[in-house]
């Protein structure tokens, strides 16, 4: 984690940000609204508090165990396997929640055995869009917002604005630039939320932003954009399923393949609809 407009980075900064400025009711957006005053408070907390990070080797790839103390009181929370999976809660030695964890099992996650290209295509083109609107609208809104912030602000290497400056405003350049700008902003302190794919913000940005840019460029309807995003997201998930939740293989590669499938989907469907109108 990197906190914007500061040199605070890493797990210690993330823990301090959650303690000082976290809003538990916002779930995965727990530190989305950190103010400049809270940033100063986080710095002060880091200066005054001994935060220790240790590597745990227990067969669980994604495993976070947080223990805090104040005076005579203590509390411990454990998250394992995936980001919202709280498996242990303890306060002053009293165990309040205790769910066994067996390695990297994903039995509690969605069954992906039905995912293949034929079923993905059929689902994306036949589902009632009202059933998926509440999932896809936040992805469009949030991911476009952080990409636009990345293009406006000074984040990381500013790859998005560099691409636009050097290669022009062609749709192919914009598709790359928006994804890069969103990633630069996300990884360099922008607190705006990102709708993820396969547990990853960069995969969520890569799977969605190029598709949105292409759909807007060709004037595709909102429905066609939804269906193209379904193709992109599900292809990304399908490819990622064979890799595993955490891997040295960069998941953005899978998301790039998903984006290519989504762009092809919206282009093909939009042109087919346009040809039908011409024949009429």
Question: Which sequence ranges carry the predicted segments?
Answer:
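Alpha-helical support elements that line or immediately flank enzyme active sites
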Residues: 19, 204-222, 261-267
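Conserved phosphate/anionic-ligand binding catalytic regions in large, soluble enzymes, centered on
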Residues: 194-208, 252-254
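Beta-strand segments within the central parallel beta-sheet cores of soluble alpha/beta enzyme folds
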Residues: 29-34, 223-234, 271-274, 280
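Signature of multi-pass transmembrane helix bundles
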Residues: 46-189
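Conserved small/polar residues in nucleotide/adenosyl-binding loops
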Residues: 1-5, 269-278
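Glycine/charged-rich beta-loop-alpha catalytic/anionic-binding loops adjacent to active sites
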Residues: 185-196, 236-246
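Early transmembrane hairpin of solute transport permeases
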Residues: 4-57, 64, 68
């Amino acid at each position: 984690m990197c906190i914007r407009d500061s040199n605070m980075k890493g797990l210690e900064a993330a823990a301090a940000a959650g303690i000082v400025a976290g809003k538990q009711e916002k779930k995965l957006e727990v530190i989305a609204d950190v103010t400049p005053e809270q940033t100063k408070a986080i710095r002060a907390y880091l200066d005054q508090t001994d935060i220790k990070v240790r590597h745990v080797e227990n067969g669980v790839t994604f495993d976070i165990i947080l223990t805090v103390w104040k005076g005579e009181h203590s509390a411990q929370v454990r998250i394992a396997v995936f980001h919202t999976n709280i498996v242990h809660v303890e306060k002053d030695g009293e165990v309040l929640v205790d769910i066994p964890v067996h390695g990297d099992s994903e039995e509690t996650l969605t069954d992906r055995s039905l995912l293949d290209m034929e079923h993905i295509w059929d689902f994306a083109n036949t589902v009632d869009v009202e059933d998926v609107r509440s999932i896809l609208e936040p992805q469009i809104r949030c991911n476009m917002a952080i990409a636009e912030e990345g293009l406006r602000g000074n984040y990381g290497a500013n790859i998005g604005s560099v691409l636009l400056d050097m290669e022009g405003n062609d749709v192919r350049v914009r598709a790359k630039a928006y994804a890069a700008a969103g990633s630069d902003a996300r990884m360099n302190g922008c607190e705006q939320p990102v709708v993820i794919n396969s547990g990853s913000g960069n995969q969520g940005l890569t799977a969605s932003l190029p598709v949105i840019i292409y759909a807007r460029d060709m004037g595709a309807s909102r429905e066609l954009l939804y269906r193209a995003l379904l193709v992109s997201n599900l292809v990304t998930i399908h490819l990622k399923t064979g890799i595993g939740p955490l891997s040295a293989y960069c998941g953005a590669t899978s998301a790039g393949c998903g984006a290519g499938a989504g762009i092809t989907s919206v282009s093909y469907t939009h042109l087919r609809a346009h040809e039908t109108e011409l024949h009429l």
